Amino acid sequence: PSSRETENVHRDVLYGCWCKGSRIGGGTLPPLSLLSTATVLKQAGHDVVLRDMIEENIGFEQLKDVVKYIDVVIVLTSTMSFVEDSNLLLELKEFNEGLKTIVFGAHPSFMPEDTLEHPGIDIIIRREPEFVVRDLISLMNEGKDYDSLNGIGYKKNNRVFVNPFYPFVDYNQIPISDRSLLSQRSHYYNPI
């Protein structure tokens, strides 16, 4: 996502990348892991809004309006983008004090304690996010405790807790991504 410092932070794309606001070759692809996770959430009956901040060119001020009325933000982060992502999440929490922030990706999976030390991050997902996020959001919506849910890390009473990994997922159980969740204004690369 964008931040106060730069329009685009980092995003892998086909044969290139976005880096600090500059496109370096290639064509963009949809955020497939977020799309897959959003699809699982939608099929579980949750209200889902998927925004590709880079492809939709949503700036920081617009982003504040997007998160004003939502309960949870889920962000895919990497080590390269982690500092800006976590700072952005902290700023967004200032506009929505009840906002819960969840991050997943390689950085939170391999460095869970380090990730949770940042005040902008409430919960991390370790390894594959689809079913862990589904179970987590279901527990949150039901007002139930998620402390024992495998595959997450979280903060409670100023302490960091990292639970065991969620069992490996049979990828045949993950549904085909619902591309209707993507903005119809997006123009993703299609090699076919």
Per-region residue spans from a language model:
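Short glycine-rich His-centered loop
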Residues: 1-26
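Generic beta-structure capping elements
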Residues: 15, 165-166, 177-179
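A residue-identity detector for tryptophan
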Residues: 18, 154, 171, 188-189
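Short catalytic helix/loop segments, enriched in acidic residues and glycine
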Residues: 19-41
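Short, P/G- and charge-enriched loop/turn segments at secondary-structure junctions
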Residues: 23-25, 149, 191
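Radical SAM [4Fe-4S] cluster-binding motif and immediate context
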Residues: 29, 172-192
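Glycine-rich beta-alpha loop elements in corrinoid/cobalamin-binding modules
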Residues: 33, 37-167, 171
